Amino acid sequence: GVIWDINRVGPSTGLPTRTQQGDLTMLYEASHGDTQHIVLIPGTVDECFEFGWRAFDVAEQFQTLVFGFSDLDLGMNRWATAGFEYPDQKLDRGKVIRTQEQLDAIENFGRYRDVDGDGIPYRTLPGSGLEPILYRGTGHDEDGIYSEDPGIYAATVARLKRKIEGARDLLPAPILREENDKQVGIIYYGSVENTITEIDDILESTTGLKVSTCRVRALPYLSLIHIRRSRRSIRS
């Protein structure tokens, strides 16, 4: 499933015509317990369209809820575009078993069994005539049977963690603008793209500071971000 959050100023009714970006951490860790979610963060109206269909693609591949996150500046105001780019290939439905032969090829099939080690189990579709689907909202084992066993619970949480971690490098990568002399770094997201570009120009023209920027476009971060941040002393 996909849920799109267009953030305005809160709390409660808040300021209904003002933009804000404070919902990001709420979406990333939504729900109770130890959990994470995939969040796509467009910064332009073109990316809003692209990330819209891409969110459904990712949700199918990883069998998980995906949040789209934009702010009121993008969601309510008028923006110009040269035209949206449509997907040039079919969306990936992920690990869907469509035939009895495919089902028989999996030893000891279970709806939540991690066959490939990536945290994403195989699934059948309702009405396919294959193995019936058993979904539970409570704790369950690999076969979907209710369980409160600590070991099974820990294994389930670890599997979900592997699934989200595996999405890192398939999500929209951050956009980096790097200076050779890395004096100042700005990490940002969302519709402040034009504002940050203006700040970059003002700082460099008035102070001579060289500004490098990184616009994050998805959570979890691209794995490369962790490597780059660990190698540099940068103020954010």
Model-derived regions: residue spans:
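Acidic/polar loop patches that form or flank catalytic/metal-binding clefts of enzymes
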Residues: 1-4, 13, 36-37, 63-69
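Flexible glycine/proline-rich, aromatic-decorated loop/lid segments
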Residues: 3-34
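Acidic, glycine-rich active-site loops and adjacent beta-strand->loop/helix elements
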Residues: 5-12, 44-46, 72-74, 217-220
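Peripheral docking tails and interdomain loops at the edges
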Residues: 31-32, 37, 46, 224, ...
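Active-site/ligand-binding-proximal alpha/beta "capping" segment
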Residues: 34-59
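Flexible, low-complexity linker and terminal segments
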Residues: 51, 56-224, 228, 236
